[in-house]
Structures are given as C-alpha cells and as structure tokens.
A protein has these predicted regions:
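N-terminal localization/anchoring segments of enzymes in phospholipid and broader phosphate metabolism
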Residues: 1-289, 293, 297, 337, ...
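Short, glycine-rich nucleotide/cofactor-binding loops
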Residues: 118-123, 304-312
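Helical hairpin unit composed of two closely spaced alpha helices linked by a short loop
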Residues: 298, 308-329, 334, 339
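Histidine/acidic-residue-rich catalytic or RNA/ligand-binding cores of hydrolases
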Residues: 314-316, 343-345, 374, 392
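Thr-Gly-centered strand-to-loop micro-motif
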Residues: 305-306, 363, 382
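A beta-strand-loop signature enriched in Asp, Gly, Thr, and Trp
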Residues: 325, 330-373
Length: 450
C-alpha cells in the first residue's frame, strides 16, 4: 500500500539509523518472507480443494436476501463457501465462551484442534493443559498450534517440549529466530480456533490467557466475544486450522484432511461463511473488502466493536457515507486502552466521524477486545481488528453470519454495551487535551506501523 511505504520513508527520514534498522527488522519483504508467503499459499490452495460448495444453499440465499447476496457472491469467489443450517451460539464475554470450550473438550472422543495467537501460563492454561493431558491418555488426538511471537513472552522456554512430552502434537507458527533477518514481529497468526470431533467449533477475539476470562484484571473489565458453531461451518474452521497447521511445517507430506471430516448433524437456521486472510494474499485482501461491503450495503443500522480504530481514508469515507444516507452508525472502542499510543490515534480518528453524525461509545468498565460488525443483514464475529495490521500484516479468521436469532443475540449485546458505555460528543472531542492535539499528527503519519 502507498500509505505503508510512505510511513516507512517518513520514519527513515526522521530517524535515519534506527528507522532503517526497524524497517530491516519489521518492514521489508525479504527473501525469507517471500518464501514463507509462497509456502503458505501452497497450503491454502491445497486445503481449498476440500471446501464444500453448497449450490442449493447459495441459490436459496440469493433469492431470499438480494442485498446481502452481493456479499455472498463475492465471498464465494474468494473461496469462502456459504453453508446453511448452522446452529450458532453467541458469547458476550470471554469467560462464557471458555466455560463451553472446557465442556466440549471434556466430551472429546476423537480429536481436538486448537489454535491461539497468545498463550499465557496461568489458571486458564492450567485447566486447559490438564484436560488435554487426560484426553491424550484416553486416546484422543490433540493438535495444538500457536504463534511464536504471541506466546514467547508469557510461556516458559520449554513450553513446546512440555506439550510434546504430554503426547500433544504441537506446531509453532513463524518461529522467532535469533538471526536478525528472520525476526518477524509482523506476519503473525492472529487466528483463534478450537474444533472438537468435527462436530463443534469455537472462534472469537479471546486468547488463551487469564485476562480474557477476567480471572485477572489488567485494564478493568475485559470484554471479549465469540461464537460456538455446529453444522457445516465447523468444516470451514477445520480447513483453516489445517491450512495453518501445514503452513507451520516444512514436511512435504500433507495431513489427511478427510480424516477430520464429519458429516454435519445440525438443523439450525443460520447461514455462515468462514472467512480467513493474511499477508500471503497481498495485495488481494478479501476480509478488508468484506468489511467495507458490510459498511456499504448497510441500510438501517451498522454497529461495530473494535479495540483499535486505525483505518485508511477510504473506509472512513464509507462509514461517513453510510451515516449520510441515514444509517444508524455506532462504534464501540475501549475506555481503558492496552496500547496508549494507539488509543490516542483511535481518539483522533473520532473527529471526522463524529462530525458526520456517527455515534462513538467508549466502554467505561474497562477494555473491549471484541471484534465484530453487525447490520440488519448479517454479522461478523472473529479475530479481525479494524486496523491495517489485521487487514494486511496478520493472519485472521472470522465467521460471517446471517440468521434472525444470532443477529438478535448480537444486537442485544450491542445495546447493553451502549448503555454501560460513555458516548463521546463532537464538542467533547474538540476540547480534548492540547497534548493530544500536538502528538496526533505525528502518530497519524505512522498510524499504519502501530
């Protein structure tokens, strides 16, 4: 992206030596990075051949939902097939999700697939590990995938070895090497997926760390959201997991995808697209386009929750145009941030949106880490932040859903969160502290790098 290049050029001009070092470490597209992209694309291409395209569900949805059908057509071309008759449960808090995740793990009889960005030692991990060890002893296959950067700081040096000794099949995505040229703080797997026996799967914004279930307090109440799915959408999440599993190894032998295929028994009423994306796809980034389409096709209301609001001008304009055509546009961000500089930049971005009638709320109980978007036609819940890093630099996943009950459940949570949040006015924004006004233009110059 031109903005990405311009940010690095500006940094190099302001900080000639350290700016170049930072670009060398994190900004460049090196030979090793290109090899990694090619390897990942091969695994994605291989896994895509196992996707199930339900032509009957596709045609039925197009007839019933002509507006949302435009998005469905796009997602079909992007290799995110539509599935019908899924049963979906929404979790308004991370602790609610983990309660059901543990229950599902306890019931596992065949296999467990787990993928998290952040893994941290603590009470949540201890309980997870205890269940996994017991399941391995019962003959259940357990595959555990995690991102090296996300887990490096909060797990022990021999974390991977500990899992292997327990009989868990473990892989690490994009290991951080001691060699400077291979240290990638970008290009991480930000995905979160749990699949049990091919019958039930979970995803959302939560990681495997105590704060995500409010077992410890870091930034007040930690609000995260997620979903549990049963039905054909489980197979979609299984494929995403297996694609990244194979991308995390140089083993030329593929896993047997069909070994994990279970015919769905769900009779739910929710249409789903399992969506995923990452830097190997650059410059074709379907998730960014799907988010923009959600904004553009909204007609009645558009509700968004994101911990970081760092978006490019074209998406700001899409939000403004939605408000101008009468859509009720509301955005929830944290009151207590986890990244102070990003918070200042997020607050700076309020201005042009508030001026055009978009309503912005800050979650006063603490930090909102949830990533979701809702319109009258559909919803997305997953790992995707509204920032450049999620759209271009990380591997992400989510579920696009269209169904009366799941949309109503998500809408109720939005409305409840509005009630316990502070609505920021345009006048309040204009009267923000002078120190913010001084630093904002500088931060905005490097917004894509934050």
């Amino acid at each position: 992206s031109p903005a990405y290049r311009q940010a690095w050029i500006a940094l190099a001009l302001i900080l000639p030596i350290s700016g170049f070092v930072m670009y060398y470490l994190w900004g460049r597209s090196s030979r090793n990075k290109k090899k990694l992209d090619q390897h990942i694309l091969r695994q994605i291409s291989y896994g895509n051949q196992f996707l199930i395209h339900d032509e009957q569900a596709y045609q039925k949805f197009l007839q019933e939902n002509p507006v949302a059908g435009r998005m469905v057509k796009y997602m079909e071309t992007a290799e995110f097939p539509l599935s019908a008759a899924n049963d979906v449960k929404y979790y308004p808090m991370g602790e609610d999700a983990f309660e059901d995740i543990f229950a599902a793990l306890e019931q596992a009889e065949d296999y467990i697939l787990i993928d998290f960005f952040i893994v941290a030692e603590g009470a949540l991990w201890d309980k997870t590990f205890e269940i996994l060890k017991r399941k391995v002893a019962q003959g259940v296959e357990v595959k555990f995938l995690y991102d090296d950067f996300g887990a490096a700081i909060r797990t022990g040096k021999y974390f991977s070895t500990m899992l292997q000794k327990a009989g868990i099949d473990v892989r690490v995505f994009n290991p951080i090497h001691k060699y400077t040229g291979e240290l990638y703080m970008n290009f991480r797997s930000h995905q979160k997926i749990v699949v049990v026996d091919g019958k039930v799967a979970f995803t959302g914004g939560f990681n495997l760390a105590d704060e995500y279930a409010n077992l410890i307090e870091r930034f007040g109440v930690w609000k995260d959201t997620g979903v549990r799915v049963s039905g054909e959408a489980v197979w979609g999440l299984t494929i995403v997991f297996l694609q990244m599993w194979e991308a995390s190894s140089t083993d030329p032998e593929h896993v047997g995808y069909l070994r994990y295929r279970v015919m769905p028994e769900s009779t739910g009423d929710t249409y789903c697209h399992v969506i995923s994306d990452g830097p190997a796809n650059n410059p074709f980034n379907p998730i960014e386009s799907i988010y923009n389409q959600m904004i553009m096709y909204s007609d009645e209301y558009l509700y968004i929750t994101t911990p970081y609001l760092v978006i490019e001008d074209y998406m700001k304009q899409s939000l403004i145009e939605a408000a101008q055509r009468g859509v009720d546009v509301r955005i929830i961000t944290p009151s207590i941030p986890d990244k102070k500089l990003v918070k200042i930049l997020t607050y700076y971005n309020y201005g042009s949106l508030l001026k055009e009638g978009i309503r912005i709320y800050e979650y006063t109980p603490g930090f909102v880490h949830a990533k979701q978007i809702l319109t009258e036609d559909a919803a997305i819940v997953g790992t995707i932040n509204m920032d450049y890093r999620s759209y271009y630099l990380h591997y992400e996943n989510g579920i696009w859903m269209s169904g009366e009950q799941i949309q109503e459940d998500i809408r109720k949570d939005f409305c409840a969160t509005f009630e316990e949040s502070h609505e920021v006015s345009y006048e309040e924004w204009k009267n923000r502290p002078r120190r913010y006004k001084f630093i904002e233009p500088v931060l905005n110059l490097f917004s894509i790098l934050l």
